[in-house]
Amino acid sequence: EPETIKFKLHYSSAYKKRIFVPLAFIAIALAFFVVAFIIDYVWSSVALAFIFASQLVGNIWVLPVSITADDNGLTLKDVIGKTNVKRGEIVSIQPLSALDGSVQLKWRGYDVKIGGKTMLPVPKWVTNDSNIVVVTIKEPKRTAYQYAISCPDEATLQQLCKWGS
């Protein structure tokens, strides 16, 4: 009789370990994933959701990106370098001042009034319309995406417009 009780206790303990250890591991892994996702979302200069939502008509999403030129054309990346923004052919690069006045800039989902009061603090380069160019990218079989790019100076702006012509 004592042997039977001992066996049952041993079996019960092993069964619990077999079930709860993997569950605990999965829970910890999920917790790390959620924390990493939140940190990345909050601290990343460009949230993926905003990149994919940038095809809204009449709106240009302002992205702090860097541009490099090579034999393959222009490559746009966010300032951290995590997200490759280029997903199609670059159609045009124009100074913001040359665009129609109805175009509205957005920064992280909020409207940005160039040269006017804004609803939230935005980087200075966003409100300096003289140094912003707009890159239009056309994806195969999809709508054109537009990105507002900050240029550090007039020479860079002119160079970008030359590449886009």
Question: What residue ranges belong to the model's regions?
Answer:
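N-terminal membrane-targeting/pre-transmembrane regions
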Residues: 1-38, 124-125, 139-146, 152-154
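Short structural boundary motif marking the start of a folded domain
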Residues: 3-5, 65, 131-133
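Non-transmembrane, membrane-adjacent beta-strand/coil modules in membrane-associated proteins
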Residues: 12-15, 77-148
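Short, surface-exposed linear segments at secondary-structure transitions and domain or protein termini
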Residues: 15-19, 93-99, 153-164
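Transmembrane helix-loop junctions and nearby membrane-interface residues
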Residues: 33, 37-40, 59-63
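Hydrophobic alpha-helical transmembrane segments
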Residues: 37-51
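Short, solvent-exposed secondary-structure boundary motifs
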Residues: 50-60, 115-117, 125
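Conserved beta-hairpin
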Residues: 54-94
